[in-house]
A protein has these predicted regions:
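Compositionally biased terminal segments of proteins
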Residues: 1-159
Length: 159
């Protein structure tokens, strides 16, 4: 599966990486990059530390606007004309361990020359099951199929 990035989107992810910001791509965008079928327009980012000032610096370097959510009025958000609303900032992942624990099992992929760390499919499934929203329930079959295919490929690679 491909994830087409605009130049500002690619720049944001590169800036986050170069600045050492620790984040995971989660949700359906991460699942699609691991072979699941489905649709999503958003790229869900789960940051280790939302108070990291480097996040705002990276967003601004990519031409975007960072709303840290630190005033408690609304959740954190990445936006602006260049980045629009493609990125969603995830503040809590249902059914998962702490960020640092999940980061240890992250899947690394390269998308258009940008290294990304993805939440593994089995953890996406766990999170979707725990959240249990209608859109999550609808995604289960595609996620389970992708998980089964991935397991089969791994078994074949071992033999």
């Amino acid at each position: 599966a491909e994830l087409a990035l605009s130049e500002p989107e690619r720049r944001l992810l590169q800036e986050l990486n170069q600045r050492g910001v620790r984040y995971l791509v989660v949700g359906m965008s991460a699942a699609l990059l691991q072979g699941a079928r489905g649709l999503t327009e958003d790229i869900d980012l789960w940051f280790e530390d939302l108070s990291d000032l480097q996040i705002g610096d990276a967003v601004r370097a990519a031409g975007g606007i960072w709303a840290s959510g630190s005033f408690g009025m609304r959740p954190p958000a990445i936006g602006g004309d260049a980045l629009e609303d493609r990125f969603d900032v995830v503040t809590h992942c249902h059914g998962l361990a702490d960020f640092i624990v999940e980061l240890e099992s992250a899947v690394s992929v390269s998308v258009e020359g940008v290294e990304l760390k993805l939440l593994p499919l089995e953890r996406i499934v766990a999170s979707k099951r725990a959240a249990n929203r209608p859109k999550d329930v609808a995604a289960w079959p595609a996620l389970e199929t992708a998980r089964a295919v991935r397991r089969e490929l791994e078994l074949n690679a071992e033999t």
